[in-house]
């Protein structure tokens, strides 16, 4: 085997931060001059999260090749330079579908198809496919869920077999939670012990245990975990709950020397990672500038921040790059009083979404921003909100709407894309992935990008109806970005407004701490200017 493989499992509780841990490890290993690839294995039976409720699963992250994935892949992107694609994710639903397809094609020659060996072999094949496609020095494989879940068992068995065949090239990290009981005044290691016992009963002996806790574990506690979990004392690592920013995680792991421990065990003798630039950025996040802007994020899933995870992070990246900080106020567009809060904000962002719930509230938000000169950034559905509001209140097309919200509207300024109406399946059938966009010169968007052609990622079925484009232009709303392949409207911009822009794509998927997205930077710049001078009056 030409690559090394790091397996990351979790125990005790869910939401431990395995995705952040995997992403942070990728950063540390890359800073040691290693080429890293990543794979997320999710035990749920959905083929992908594309049709899952955001309240249940969080946002859907889209790759360049149009794969709808778990939000953890967003962490992978933001922390590292790993290339993400269809080879970077697999679910139980996909694995079972592949096996059933092979059975129907006669690949198994009449054998009884079983979880072992057929499902486990397919999981191993997914791991090898990822390695073959990317040719990494190190492949990090994160297994979703918690040890003990029934759904996880085939994945853990596959890992056991893989480690048995390639023991010298594999490293297993088990992440657990060590709770602090206030009444007893001490931390409890028993949940970690039981979790490791469950993992060992499957046949996987972890090479390291990563313990998450509220505060630092004492050497005695680490020694106890080492003794009862049968791992060396120097293989017990600790990360505490993050105080300020998720971007502190790589620094915590670096302080624990976990990446050095891993590379030495795998025989990868590399240089010490250099995180000086990362430390500088994190220090600025810990000590934010006094120049702060308030951004109202108007949506319908605002009670669950993970539903807009990439948007939150992209705003943070942009503000940091401008030596500013951002306070994000989630505003429910169904709340009858949300406009009172939005009026006090320095900018408004309406993110992507689907369905009519909260639609009219978003339109009132766009109207407020247009009339008051508040910077407005509409993403996907947020762009469609901008267009419909403008049609109703500037073009005086009072019943203008999107056909998604009103199929009988007399003025369908937003309509379904050609070819979408005939589709029966909903999963994986939208316009997905990266497409080129040509940007008009002399526009705010061109000024932000500094170039005339960009690639951006999409996830939508509806588009601006080109039958209305000239009318919009006559009244000051311009299409300033188009797809050269399909002639679709990708970006709109309003004249005589400080910053009111809508994009059909999802720029948040490309933003990183070390490389903020230019449109988010432009938006925050406009919000800073607005916060300093709120005397704008619409012409």
UniProtKB/Swiss-Prot annotation:
Disulfide bonds: none
GO CC terms in record: cytosol
UniProt-annotated stretches for the region Amidoligase domain: 1-268
Assigned EC number: 6.3.4.2
Activation/inhibition comment: Allosterically activated by GTP, when glutamine is the substrate; GTP has no effect on the reaction when ammonia is the substrate. The allosteric effector GTP functions by stabilizing the protein conformation that binds the tetrahedral intermediate(s) formed during glutamine hydrolysis. Inhibited by the product CTP, via allosteric rather than competitive inhibition.
Catalysed transformations (reactions): UTP + L-glutamine + ATP + H2O = CTP + L-glutamate + ADP + phosphate + 2 H(+); L-glutamine + H2O = L-glutamate + NH4(+); UTP + NH4(+) + ATP = CTP + ADP + phosphate + 2 H(+)
GO biological process: 'de novo' CTP biosynthetic process; pyrimidine nucleobase biosynthetic process
Record: active site: 380, 506, 508
Keyword Ligase: yes
Gene Ontology terms for molecular function: ATP binding; CTP synthase activity; glutaminase activity; identical protein binding; metal ion binding
Domain Glutamine amidotransferase type-1 per the UniProt entry, residue ranges: 294-533
Sequence positions that bind ATP: 15-20, 72
Residues that bind L-glutamine: 55, 353, 381-384, 404, 461
Binding residue positions for UTP: 14, 188-193, 224
One Pfam family in the UniProt entry: GATase
Residues holding CTP: 14, 149-151, 188-193, 224
InterPro entries reported in the protein's UniProt record: Class_I_gatase-like, CTP_synthase, CTP_synthase_N, GATASE, GATase1_CTP_Synthase, P-loop_NTPase
Binding, Mg(2+): 72, 142
Enzyme class: ligase
Entry keyword set: ATP-binding, Glutamine amidotransferase, Ligase, Magnesium, Metal-binding, Nucleotide-binding, Pyrimidine biosynthesis
Family affiliation: Belongs to the CTP synthase family.
Miscellaneous comment in the UniProt entry for this protein: CTPSs have evolved a hybrid strategy for distinguishing between UTP and CTP. The overlapping regions of the product feedback inhibitory and substrate sites recognize a common feature in both compounds, the triphosphate moiety. To differentiate isosteric substrate and product pyrimidine rings, an additional pocket far from the expected kinase/ligase catalytic site, specifically recognizes the cytosine and ribose portions of the product inhibitor.
Record note on quaternary structure: Homotetramer.
Function statement: Catalyzes the ATP-dependent amination of UTP to CTP with either L-glutamine or ammonia as the source of nitrogen. Regulates intracellular CTP levels through interactions with the four ribonucleotide triphosphates.
Protein name: CTP synthase
Organism taxonomic ancestry: Bacteria, Pseudomonadati, Chlamydiota, Chlamydiia, Chlamydiales
